[in-house]
Amino acid sequence: MPKQAIRIMDTTLRDGSHAIRHRFTKENVRQIVQALDEAGVPVIEVSHGDGLGGSSLQYGMSLVEEMELIEEAAKTSRRAKIAALLLPGIGTKKELQQAKDCGIQMVRIATQCSEADVSEQHFGLAKELGLETVGFLMMAHMLSPEELAQQAKLMESYGADIVYIVDSAGTMLPQDVIDRVIALKKVLNVPIGFHAHNNLGLAIGNSLAAIQAGATNIDASTRGLGAGSGNTQTEVLVAVLSRMGIETGIDLFQIMDAAEYIVDPLMDSPMIVNRDALTIGFTGVYSTFLWHAKQAGEKFGVDPREILIELGRRKAVAGQEDWILDVASDLSSAKGR
């Protein structure tokens, strides 16, 4: 495995927001950013779990307005870059400008893996604002490695400084990750990143697979705090990479203490691979489908796991929630209910 230094981007204050129902306070942000910054974490992502502009009835209301949290993070950090996530269609160029004014130095622009073309204007503005830019290809398992590489190439052409393979459903196996990193390396001139979810218990393993294949930017979250079963655990990743002789620039004891004494007390429960998360990882569908599948399953007398398996087979993506009732009805009819 290569010994090239790995840049870890910590997403506790963004993906972790999902796990605590977007209840971060300014004091939480101050304490977490200070601890991560002092430990040597180079990039800290701060925003609503669904990115800039995500606070809404649809995606969940933030306890504290995200621009206040970003401003607090930027004011607190001494060395780490403050980043924010932006999903075109949820966040707008207006929110991106506001986030820049509040102190972000990096924006991670996320699209469905097959829809990179919707990000062109956002990358354009980000470059005008002087931000480091990251392309974030979500649900990356849904395209072949070669198809994903072409979407990554689009993001690079729009101005992405890094392109991330994002395992949004936590469904990839290590070889899936390796194949996609290799495919991107063949066509890109910019570095590659990987964002894992732990729904199959493979977040650390998949992150190592990405590094083995040539990724140099890896997302992680202290205590693994994130959607579903969480993300690659920052302190564990730092320890493993240290054992392997791979430099991260992060002090292991300090990041362990940040997770133990600052992040853990904020958690409602530990991040575990429970039945719901495992179902998402196994079926490879969006976690937002789960609640709807449970409702449809109750209505039609069908196990919601069967609904999700069929949705995965049909390659349903976010925005196709209307398929859920159709699938439940079809399964019920097939069983003669």
Swiss-Prot record:
The keyword Metal-binding applies. The record marks R14 as: Transition state stabilizer. Keywords: Aromatic hydrocarbons catabolism, Lyase, Manganese, Metal-binding. GO terms for molecular function: 2-isopropylmalate synthase activity; 4-hydroxy-2-oxovalerate aldolase activity; manganese ion binding. It catalyses: (S)-4-hydroxy-2-oxopentanoate = acetaldehyde + pyruvate. The active site is at H18 (proton acceptor). It comes from the Bacteria. Mn(2+) binds at D15, H195, H197. Coiled coil: none annotated. InterPro entries: 2-IPM_HCS-like (IPR050073), 4OH_2_O-val_aldolase (IPR017629), Aldolase_TIM (IPR013785), DmpG_comm (IPR012425), DRE_TIM_HOA (IPR035685), PYR_CT (IPR000891). Substrate binds at R14, D15, S168, H195, Y286. Belongs to the 4-hydroxy-2-oxovalerate aldolase family. This is 4-hydroxy-2-oxovalerate aldolase. The gene is nahM.
